[in-house]
Amino acid sequence: MSLPFYQRCHQHYDLSYRNKDVRSTVSHYQREKKRSAVYTQGSTAYSSRSSAAHRRESEAFRRASASSSQQQASQHALSSEVSRKAASAYDYGSSHGLTDSSLLLDDYSSKLSPKPKRAKHSLLSGEEKENLPSDYMVPIFSGRQKHVSGITDTEEERIKEAAAYIAQRNLLASEEGITTSKQSTASKQTTASKQSTASKQSTASKQSTASRQSTASRQSVVSKQATSALQQEETSEKKSRKVVIREKAERLSLRKTLEETETYHAKLNEDHLLHAPEFIIKPRSHTVWEKENVKLHCSIAGWPEPRVTWYKNQVPINVHANPGKYIIESRYGMHTLEINGCDFEDTAQYRASAMNVKGELSAYASVVVKRYKGEFDETRFHAGASTMPLSFGVTPYGYASRFEIHFDDKFDVSFGREGETMSLGCRVVITPEIKHFQPEIQWYRNGVPLSPSKWVQTLWSGERATLTFSHLNKEDEGLYTIRVRMGEYYEQYSAYVFVRDADAEIEGAPAAPLDVKCLEANKDYIIISWKQPAVDGGSPILGYFIDKCEVGTDSWSQCNDTPVKFARFPVTGLIEGRSYIFRVRAVNKMGIGFPSRVSEPVAALDPAEKARLKSRPSAPWTGQIIVTEEEPSEGIVPGPPTDLSVTEATRSYVVLSWKPPGQRGHEGIMYFVEKCEAGTENWQRVNTELPVKSPRFALFDLAEGKSYCFRVRCSNSAGVGEPSEATEVTVVGDKLDIPKAPGKIIPSRNTDTSVVVSWEESKDAKELVGYYIEASVAGSGKWEPCNNNPVKGSRFTCHGLVTGQSYIFRVRAVNAAGLSEYSQDSEAIEVKAAIGGGVSPDVCPALSDEPGGLTASRGRVHEASPPTFQKDALLGSKPNKPSLPSSSQNLGQTEVSKVSETVQEELTPPPQKAAPQGKSKSDPLKKKTDRAPPSPPCDITCLESFRDSMVLGWKQPDKIGGAEITGYYVNYREVIDGVPGKWREANVKAVSEEAYKISNLKENMVYQFQVAAMNMAGLGAPSAVSECFKCEEWTIAVPGPPHSLKCSEVRKDSLVLQWKPPVHSGRTPVTGYFVDLKEAKAKEDQWRGLNEAAIKNVYLKVRGLKEGVSYVFRVRAINQAGVGKPSDLAGPVVAETRPGTKEVVVNVDDDGVISLNFECDKMTPKSEFSWSKDYVSTEDSPRLEVESKGNKTKMTFKDLGMDDLGIYSCDVTDTDGIASSYLIDEEELKRLLALSHEHKFPTVPVKSELAVEILEKGQVRFWMQAEKLSGNAKVNYIFNEKEIFEGPKYKMHIDRNTGIIEMFMEKLQDEDEGTYTFQLQDGKATNHSTVVLVGDVFKKLQKEAEFQRQEWIRKQGPHFVEYLSWEVTGECNVLLKCKVANIKKETHIVWYKDEREISVDEKHDFKDGICTLLITEFSKKDAGIYEVILKDDRGKDKSRLKLVDEAFKELMMEVCKKIALSATDLKIQSTAEGIQLYSFVTYYVEDLKVNWSHNGSAIRYSDRVKTGVTGEQIWLQINEPTPNDKGKYVMELFDGKTGHQKTVDLSGQAYDEAYAEFQRLKQAAIAEKNRARVLGGLPDVVTIQEGKALNLTCNVWGDPPPEVSWLKNEKALASDDHCNLKFEAGRTAYFTINGVSTADSGKYGLVVKNKYGSETSDFTVSVFIPEEEARMAALESLKGGKKAK
């Protein structure tokens, strides 16, 4: 083998071992040919050696040599597999024809040893072996990572696989049943002596069988002494035919086994497959025009797979030095070098070098670049001085001179507005400066090189590079990179440019679209695409208008009448051969916004014609023209087009494409497009007026949602051809869906004016254009766009934010179909620089199409290594990509990348530094203000002292400086006679604990100490010098003091005290601790213990503190010897709960995940959360997961169980002791697990379970009600374990607002008996409810359903809503009532009692449909059967009420109850006979029982005491009352069920007054009885004729007998002859007038009188004259009157 030239002359970058490396490798390759038999271990050597071994073995057996036996035993000692491997070639040795008996065969297993394959120690000289480390293997070739191909990687792969390969092969071999054993010669001789004349073959067969079973040894060593004779006794035996046949069969079996074994081992021998590279297809030379692309291809075979390196003029091509210039690919053995945009410098000889472990092979090809028509590319030269770009290591100072490139006055993150101008620039300083040689400067936007245009211009003044925007548009937004290349070195710098929308002319109008491009151009139409704007003006965008303008004119015309929403549109109506430009405007309800930037000019040409116009003559020119004349074939009708398909379909248009027919004649053809609705054969021609000239066509005015088929016909002057095959059915509508909203918006701090926002990309999004990010000040509700050009990826840096302000963010995705819904708002984040000032200068920032790391470049020069130019690579790189090589490495030392890696896969951005907006990025060494070294530790104490060492302890610094403390450094010094000595370092490596053991001290020497803390910002100031401590052996038996006391979770009545065990535990281990406390101002004798028994924990929750009191604490350790010295004091600590203090809360999310959450509003930028369990850090706990964001932290339990019981606490660093804890005991564990299960397997809450009810028509309603249901809730209806669906029998309904779920059945039949179940599913939550309808339950329900059905039929006519019933009114009357419905005037309502009509309701104009019959003073005579009948032409209904027997009794009891309740209170009334107690009721019936009691005893009725009812009065009469009648009287009215009582107290004043009244009435009665009175006989008026006699008789009474006198006209009348007055026997008075005259007329009165009283009885006497006498008297009086005149 030979090394390639460039490897032999290569200068290794590591000079410390480069010479040894190369010399060893060269030596190895020089010896490789000589030892090829040893190294390759090919199958040929194997077979030849096996043959020779077999022949030597056979000869040895025949001669039976004892010396050979000894030699063979020696050979077994050297290689355990020799004899068996030698015999494995029994039948195949002679066929190979090898007779070299001296051939040396090495053990194959040693050849597969990994160490010789890896290190090749046997190939090195003794000096080289001494210089080599034992574990270092010399590489065959050392080069830069990933950029040099060769033997290195192949060897490394073989080294790594060697051990595993041997193990695998041995395993496979062992599975074949092969064993390793050593067999002595004697055993062989014994075996041979027992065999027949075929013993030689039998012995060989056995040995061959052993060889077939071995895979660990395939070679043997056969010495020349093997030919010596063996002393062996031969015996002859007669063999039967059966034995011979068996032996022959064994030989045939052995032969087959050996063939299989050799084939198996040939497969295991990988060296048999090795072969050098071989070019199957070599690269071809090319001659191309300038600015065209060229590809060089080659195909290479070889094993291991060769590495391919491409060279240009013998210099390796670095794809990163010229990004986008070269693309190297390797796929399936085909290797390609693509050169883009060839120029004159690309004219060169190109070489493809293929290399593997077997060698190297090259193939050459030349590329010649010609300039077309002598055009001169002026863009290759810069304005100003003459420039000469440096490339491929050629510089004025020779090969690979080093250049230092620096940027000064760099441009920062910039903000512009549409329509404005902007310039980006920086000053470029290159050292050393070379005359006439200028750097190559290139500008990039999002990784795409920029070329000068009317929108952007570049300028290089010799010192400053400038990029100028003449008219900003949103298309100009992106990451801008300036890349300066000088020779093989380069440097670059990037910053982002944001372009805001211009102020709208119409308030609320949308912003302008962007990126208007031509997707496809044809002679009939051009498809235009664009991107939707981020700002819609406050109302949704209704669509877009597309405008076109012919190049050379200023006349814009609108292409569509109605706005289109899809961001693609085919513009038709174009004139073939003319060029157009386009623009797009968005419209919403407020108006039309600004137009977009115009597109690039596009010509309306057939693609083939366009390609013909752009084509150039092929090279070289031959000067020959061959013309073939054919007879024209006229009149050929073209055939049908082929490959007709729908290439694009939206709701607005459908695009068809096809291929021209093969048979079309010599003239041009045109096309007619036809359509028909799916399922019909009604074909309609779409372009009826003008045929289509191009094989593509866009159809408009199709009905959205309908399905169509299409076909195309060709036509020419000969006619219209047959139609093509119709397309498949196409539904008109947008095939592209609007993307889903992104998720998991996570903001993180970056700088003082920027925040990095990351998100989870939209799922299943197709043709995604990018994302828009919006920001809003928390609580304002006003959103502003962070980018106006969609960005790809899932990360973006939002700039231009206000420092210290809190922002929330949201993201939406966009594709051609539209913009997605907004994502959920992120958590609020305060804008401030992260620790370290944002992106670390040593870590490559993650960039994407939303470039998040807008950073300055590092302060050193890069060589031509991976740049940030391909957009996907630049903007999609990750932070963990390898950093770029330093500037000390040159191009010649780089490896050529693996051919399968393209530029797009390899390009990575250089490490850069982040700079806040508004500050120069040119000062990378400026100190960060948000982090600082920690303050000094304090309270240094000696924890334990030994004879020559001491253990120190100290307290953590009060201020940690914004980052966690990473360690401490301890210094000490001796103090001799009070004079301190020189400080010395106690530890070189920082210690992480607040305790450290300092060794190698001097016994009885006094020392002082100081401690300094360190964090990522640096080493802090040292602490104050400690007290003097004497280094001496502590011999005390009790433990030392605990240390590192800390108070946390301080509340108004409690706190947690923590400490660390003492370093010195005494003579026995520490068994516990005692904790003491006292008030800070109290005296030393005020210490009191908190625990009576020692506690084993190193923490204690102190309770019972007084709010506002300051306390100090100390801890003492105890062991078997006693209690040790108290610790240093902890505190003072004030017992108070500070405002805003929050506690750890437990949360169980929807997935059942249990977590502890804590929030702190008083965090500083340097604060962090620290979780612990039982006050031991949980940082490495596999059962817990901690996540912190902003001022919130969450600790999640992966699998909460008994192992997780304990106290969980969270401390906030860099605060004044903010902490909180949460206890999880067994009860809390059970509660949380139950809650977790409920959340993990949620159930839909149910208000009411599944129930059944019968509706009015006999329908059956199954229903249940859930607490709430979302719009996605589903219900499965199950009957007897089978799902039922809506149909004629079942009607289902779900009311998601009320949660009611219903199923209706018209009728219950016998087959409907069974179990009904409703299964609910709402998201993850499920539930079910079941009702069982079997047996009596089902029959009862079925009967009720039938009854309700009949009831519904009944209710179609006049019917009773409420049947006849009774009610007792307040007046104790009985009211019979019923409620009727559906009646009209013609309806008859008749009342019956005992089938006798008692009432007819002729006028039933009642509002409520109530019919009543009132029965007053209801009694037994009213008992009977009452009935009401409703009847009209629609039907009849009746209601019957039985008021007999028990029903009558029940009614009477209710009547009696009402009467009893109507009773008035008992009153007392005196009578002449005695005293009466009484009460009034509404009316009285006999069924109402009345009972009286006196002083709790029932009254025995007699003549003196009796009761009765008079009308409505119920009374108790007590005649001639005595004092014994005093007391409480109760009247009880019993209605048949209940007694109703009325009471009165007849005692005291009530009795006295009643009794006095009784006496008065009694006397009045006596007087009344004996009073004089007229008993009768005198009329009221007496009319008597004059002259008659009047006789009147009158009876009088009185005791004593009364005196009698008469009156006439109120005057006393005396008895005389005319008027005779008599009084006889004291009882009778006579009144007589004889000869009554008119003078006797008048009023008379009889007056009787005795001592008890008097009485007057009046009567009137009227005397009249007869008629004749009266007439005469009248005449006489008349006459007398005339005379008087």
UniProtKB/Swiss-Prot annotation:
Listed CDD domains = FN3 (cd00063), Ig (cd00096), IgI_Myomesin_like_C (cd05737), IgI_titin_I1-like (cd20951)
Residues the record lists as Phosphoserine modifications: 113, 883, 887, 1054
Please name the InterPro entries in this protein's record.
FN3_dom (IPR003961), FN3_sf (IPR036116), Ig-like_dom (IPR007110), Ig-like_dom_sf (IPR036179), Ig-like_fold (IPR013783), Ig_I-set (IPR013098), Ig_sub (IPR003599), Ig_sub2 (IPR003598)
Q: Where in the cell is it found?
A: Cytoplasm, Myofibril, Sarcomere, M line
Keywords carried by this UniProt record: Cytoplasm, Disulfide bond, Immunoglobulin domain, Muscle protein, Phosphoprotein, Repeat, Thick filament
**Which spans does this entry mark as compositional bias, Polar residues?**
221-233, 889-902
Where does the Fibronectin type-III domain lie? 512-607, 640-734, 741-834, 933-1034, 1041-1140
The molecular function terms of the Gene Ontology recorded here are: identical protein binding; kinase binding; protein homodimerization activity; structural constituent of muscle
The reply to whether Disulfide bond figures as a keyword in the UniProt entry is: yes
Name recorded for this polypeptide: Myomesin-1
Organism equals Homo sapiens (Human)
